[in-house]
Structures are given as C-alpha cells and as structure tokens.
Regions:
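Active-site metal-binding core of divalent-cation-utilizing nuclease and nuclease-like domains
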Residues: 1-16
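Alpha-helical scaffolding within the catalytic cores
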Residues: 4, 45-47
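C-terminal tail/extension regions appended to the core domain(s) of diverse proteins
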Residues: 30-34, 47-55, 68-132
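Well-ordered, non-membrane alpha-helical segments in soluble/globular domains
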Residues: 37-43
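Phosphate/oxyanion-binding active-site loops and adjacent basic polyanion-contact surfaces
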Residues: 1-2, 33-37
Length: 132
C-alpha cells in the first residue's frame, strides 16, 4: 500500500507522524462536489489522511458560481451541517463535525473536524489540452 499523498500538510516538528493535511479540489461549478466529498468521506473519515490529528482541511477552487452555493452543495452531499468559523463568518469558510471509522486496534481520535474553504475564480477560463 502506498502512503497517502496530501496536497499540503503542516507537520508537527516534535512528531512527524502528526500532520494537519489540506486536500484541494477544483470545482467547475458549485454543484460539482462529488470528488471533493469522496476525499472527505474516504480519506479523512476513514483515517487514511490525518490519522493522528482530530482535524484537517479541504480547499475548493471554484471556477464559476458562488462560494455560498458550493458550501451548500458540500453540506448536502456530506449530509452534515457546516458551521461558521467564529470571527471569520464573512469569509467563504466553514467546518463540519464528524465521527471517524477508526480501524480496529488503532488509537486515532474518532472525533474529526473538517475545515472547508472555497476560493472563487470568477471569469477564469481553463485551457483545454488537445489529444490529437
């Protein structure tokens, strides 16, 4: 089995096993959250990402649409409430609370908070690569 590869992780110097990972996904539209939700459910909540940490983060790069709509779609797809981050409610970020499926024999934290940040890129046009 290959170790997980996060997009970005902050590592605790005292114990390199402990890291706070961030996973990033491009969202073409606010409703295109399947891959985003897949990483939350299958990487973070199954302890593949951040097994020794009680939190992690997802970053969404939204190509078109509103961040508030993307956050709403994420909440619906994950089947949970997204809470405002105290002191930062005007920003397009929220967090969700989960109970993880900890593998038998492991002492990983079962309670997990996932932070969600949506960055809007209005008017961005993505280039398409020709396969000719």
């Amino acid at each position: 089995a290959q170790p997980p590869e996060y997009d970005l992780a902050f590592v605790l110097r005292a114990d390199e096993r402990i890291m706070w990972p961030l996973e990033a996904k491009v969202l073409e539209t606010p409703g295109a959250v399947a891959a985003y939700a897949h990483d939350v459910e299958n990487e973070f909540l199954k302890c593949r990402y951040a097994p020794f940490s009680s939190s992690g983060a997802m970053v969404a790069y939204l190509i078109s649409g509103a961040a508030t709509d993307a956050l709403s779609s994420i909440a619906t797809r994950l089947g949970c409430e997204l809470h405002e981050v105290v002191g930062h409610s005007a920003r397009p970020n929220r967090y969700s609370k989960h109970t993880r499926c900890v593998p038998p024999g492991k002492t990983y934290p079962s309670s997990f908070d996932c932070y969600h940040l949506v960055l809007e890129y209005p008017g961005l046009t993505r280039s398409r690569v020709s396969t000719r």
